[in-house]
Amino acid sequence: MLIIKAILRTEIKKSITRKIRKNGGCPAVIYNKNKSPNINVQLSNKDLSHPENVHYFLKNNKVQILINNEFTITAKIQDVQYHPYKSNIIHIDFIHITTQSRS
C-alpha cells in the first residue's frame, strides 16, 4: 500500500491553496463518511509525481496518509484533478476508510 506524507492545514482560503501550488505542493481533502469534519492537508508534488506512485492515482487504490509524522489514515482516492496543460496534480480528494468490527 502506498504511503503519502501530508501536512495538516488549517486555512482553506483560495489564496492559501494558490500559494501551496506555487511552492510545489498539492492541496487535498480527506472526506469522512460520518458527521465528523473533513481533514484538509497539503501534499508534496514531488512525492505525487514519482513514476511508481502515478499508477496508484489512476486505479483508485487505497493509500495510507501519514499526517505530520504523527498519525496515519487509510483512505481511498476519490478524485484527482490535473493541470490543463501541465502534467502535475493540482488537487486530490480522498475518502476516509474506517474499519468497524461487526459483532
From Swiss-Prot:
One of its GO terms (biological process) is translation. One of its GO terms (cellular component) is cytosolic large ribosomal subunit. GO terms for molecular function: 5S rRNA binding; structural constituent of ribosome. InterPro entries: Rbsml_bL25/Gln-tRNA_synth_N, Ribosomal_bL25/Gln-tRNA_synth, Ribosomal_bL25_short, Ribosomal_L25_dom, Ribosomal_uL5_bac-type. Keywords: Ribonucleoprotein, Ribosomal protein, RNA-binding, rRNA-binding. Part of the 50S ribosomal subunit; part of the 5S rRNA/L5/L18/L25 subcomplex. Contacts the 5S rRNA. Binds to the 5S rRNA independently of L5 and L18. This is one of the proteins that binds to the 5S RNA in the ribosome where it forms part of the central protuberance. Belongs to the bacterial ribosomal protein bL25 family. This is Large ribosomal subunit protein bL25. It comes from Blochmanniella floridana. The lineage of its organism: Bacteria, Pseudomonadati, Pseudomonadota, Gammaproteobacteria, Enterobacterales.
